[in-house]
UniProtKB/Swiss-Prot annotation:
Involved in actively transporting phosphate into cells via Na(+) cotransport. Residues 1-44 are annotated as: Disordered. Residues 112-136, 235-363, 430-486, 548-551 are extracellular. This is Sodium-dependent phosphate transport protein 2B. It comes from Rattus norvegicus. It is found in: Apical cell membrane. It catalyses: 3 Na(+)(out) + phosphate(out) = 3 Na(+)(in) + phosphate(in). Belongs to the SLC34A transporter family.
Length: 695
């Protein structure tokens, strides 16, 4: 007999059998009785099933490696095949497909409209504050302050075109130089990427979908931040963007042209203008330093007005201020003259929901913000569900291959540049990089578009939004043509420079790796995604802006040590990953620091505890409301919420004693197995309780 009988005829499949063990034998068909094997004594030996826990393979077999979470999932079609349907089923399938397509277009339309209303809501909430940021000209000469002002203003108004138009107006009025406006343009480029990051939060229900969607959204953020980290110091030292755009304007003669074609606005404006209409000139007037604009409302009341010029008697300080000597007289106290005065006559009111409301801008903004976020979330959920039901089987295979497959060798390197052109063209059509990237985010989440393909599409959207700005600048009046065109060209060449830095060489595509790392963290700790948004788009810009108000010495004194600390951590992390041998033993990992300084687990425990306490309080409120409802209704149809039932069940389960599980002599058995059988069998000379389920 072998020294290790458990290993005889071993096979990874637990359904295989071994020989020489006694116990309850399964029935052997008559045709197999003649082929049963015998042992040395000549007695027949039956084959019995070996429980997995009795096999030494449980100890020596390595677990299979997990699948890569970044691999695109197989969207299998579990429905009835087309060939298996009858005529009625085929007709119903066609109508279902048409209905799903119509619903998809409808939800996509509501999705884009909700983004437009969301932008208006942000302008109502923070538009005047954004204008005040621009009106503080004392710190605009600081490039770092200009950068964070661009980020904050674009985040507040949720529109890079609005912030760019404010900058153009200030440059045309000589309130701001082109050199000081370039860092603000860079900040606006960063701030516009927050929209699709917010959209990615709506897919937090599924961890793998959220991992891909959040990484696909933040690849835009990392590209913009990395480009600014390199190009802002370069621009501050050499002013290459200013000189390059000056050279372009002097080389080519530009004339006033037509505005960029409104393709998407023509479809969405009839609906969004029924909800809210804003007077965006108020923000520009606040930025220009007009004190009277602070008391104006951003909500547009009168859409049709007429300006009339009339002659009116006005008082002047002295006769020298009169229009002419013939139109000047005094009454002994004041000097009067006749002047032309322009009066605006209101003709017709706007037709939107809030035109007759007397609510302040902040209240209307909060209402629209809440409603638009709810609609945005609902539309995104339905779009993902519809895409998940449509993109199955052969259709999904064709689309995934079309979007993610490279050109054949030796032209594979051209695929990414074609994707950049496609992204630029699509953004030019919809006239908004936020709309294009936000619509692409759910496709990344469900696995139709890979992160590697989404990256060049996102870079193309950055180019597309600048071409729209260039066409809009060409439609500007003559006094603002040069300034607006130069700023649009600065934005264009900034994005071109970023692409040259972070795309042509595969090794330099750091945004993809950083976005995947952040996606892994956010999938494990989903609260970290919200922290990322608040920290990088609100707290950090506000902190830098506050330090800029205190002056250069304070900004340098606080910022330089923080930057040096970040660089030290990055260098140490790189050495730990690449060359750990040159480091002391203590510095080869982060265990010398407290756990909360190098791990998110303690913070996750705190947040989980806080959310569970909030859930219990919420459930208590639900239980009270439920009981009041039952008392009022006088029936037993009302039921408490699901969370209340779960809490009550958990409390009951804690009071039920758990019976100790049966013990096993075999060391390969798990110590915590439940005894569900009553029969006893003898296997390999050892007695054990039979188990129908092993945990």
């Amino acid at each position: 007999m072998a020294p290790w009988p458990e290993l005889e005829n071993a096979h990874p499949n637990p359904n295989k059998f071994i020989e020489g063990a006694s116990g309850p034998q399964s029935s052997i068909p008559d045709k197999d009785k003649g082929t049963s094997k015998t042992n040395d004594s000549g007695t027949p030996v039956a084959k019995i099933e070996l429980l997995p826990s009795y096999s030494a393979l449980v100890l020596i077999e390595e677990p299979p490696e997990g699948n890569d979470p970044w691999d695109l999932p197989e969207l299998q079609d579990n429905g009835i095949k087309w060939s298996e349907r009858d005529s009625k089923g085929k007709i119903l399938c066609i109508f279902q497909g048409i209905g799903k397509f119509i619903l998809l277009l409808g939800f996509l339309y509501l999705f884009v409209c909700s983004l437009d209303v969301l932008s208006s809501a942000f302008q109502l909430v923070g538009g005047k504050m954004a204008g005040q940021f621009f009106s503080n000209n004392s710190i605009m000469s600081n490039p770092v302050a200009g950068l964070v002002i661009g980020v904050l203003v674009t985040v507040m108004v949720q529109s890079s075109s609005t912030s760019s138009s404010i900058i153009v107006s200030m440059v045309a009025s000589s309130l701001l130089s082109v050199r000081a406006a370039i860092p603000i343009i860079m900040g606006a480029n960063i701030g516009t990427s927050i929209t699709n990051t917010i959209v990615a939060l709506m897919q937090a229900g599924d961890r793998n979908e959220f991992r891909r969607a959040f990484a696909g959204a933040t690849v835009h953020d990392f590209f913009n931040w990395l480009s600014v980290l390199v190009l802002l110091p370069l621009e501050a030292a050499t002013h290459y963007l200013e000189k390059l755009t000056n050279l372009v304007l002097e080389t080519f003669s530009f004339q006033n042209g037509e505005d960029a074609p409104d393709i998407l606005k023509v479809i969405t404006d009839p609906f969004t203008k029924l909800i809210i209409q804003l007077d965006k000139k108020v923000i520009q007037q606040i930025a220009m330093g007009d004190s009277e604009a602070q008391n104006k409302s951003l909500i547009k009341i009168w859409c049709k007005t007429i300006s009339n010029v009339i002659e009116e008697n006005v008082t002047v300080p002295s006769p020298d201020n009169c229009t002419s000597p013939s139109y000047c007289w005094t009454d002994g106290i004041q000097t009067w003259t006749i002047q032309n005065v322009t009066e605006k006559e209101n003709i017709a009111k706007c037709q939107h929901i809030f035109v007759n409301f007397s609510l302040p801008d902040l209240a209307v903004g909060i209402i629209l913000l809440t409603v638009s976020l709810l609609i945005l979330c609902g539309c995104l959920i339905m779009i993902v569900k519809l895409l998940g039901s449509v993109l199955r089987g052969q259709v999904a295979t064709v689309i995934k291959k079309t979007l993610n497959t490279d050109f054949p060798f030796p032209f594979a390197w051209l695929t990414g540049y074609l994707a950049i052109l496609v992204g630029a063209g699509m953004t030019f059509i919809v006239q908004s990089s936020s709309v294009f990237t936000s619509a692409m985010t759910p496709l990344i989440g469900i696995g139709v578009i890979s992160i590697e393909r989404a990256y060049p599409l996102t870079l193309g959207s950055n180019i597309g939004t600048t071409t729209t700005a260039i066409l809009a600048a060409l439609a500007s009046p003559g006094n603002t043509l040069r300034s607006s065109l130069q700023i649009a060209l600065c934005h264009f060449f900034f994005n071109i420079s970023g692409i040259l830095l972070w795309y042509p060489i595969p090794f330099t595509r750091l945004p993809i790796r950083l976005a995947k790392g952040l996606g892994n963290i956010s999938a494990k700790y989903r609260w970290f995604a919200v922290f990322y948004l608040i920290f990088f788009f609100l707290l950090t810009p506000l902190t830098v802006f506050g330090l800029s108000l205190a002056g250069w010495p304070v900004l340098v004194g606080v910022g330089v040590p923080i930057i040096l600390l970040i660089l030290l951590v990055l260098c140490l992390r790189m050495l730990q990953a690449r060359c750990p041998r040159i480091l002391p033993l203590k510095l080869r990992d982060w265990n010398f620091l407290p756990l909360w300084m190098h791990s998110l687990k303690p913070w996750d425990n705190i947040i989980s505890l806080a959310t569970s306490c909030f859930q219990r309080r919420c459930c208590c409120c639900c239980r009270v409301c439920c009981r009041v409802c039952c008392m009022v209704c006088g029936c037993k149809c009302c039921r408490c919420s699901k969370c209340c039932k779960n809490l009550e069940e958990e409390e009951k389960e804690q009071d039920v004693p758990v019976k100790a599980s049966g013990g096993f002599d075999n060391t390969a058995m798990s110590k915590e197995c439940q005894d569900e059988g009553k029969g006893q069998v003898e296997v390999l000379g050892m007695k054990a309780l039979s188990n129908t389920t092993v945990f």
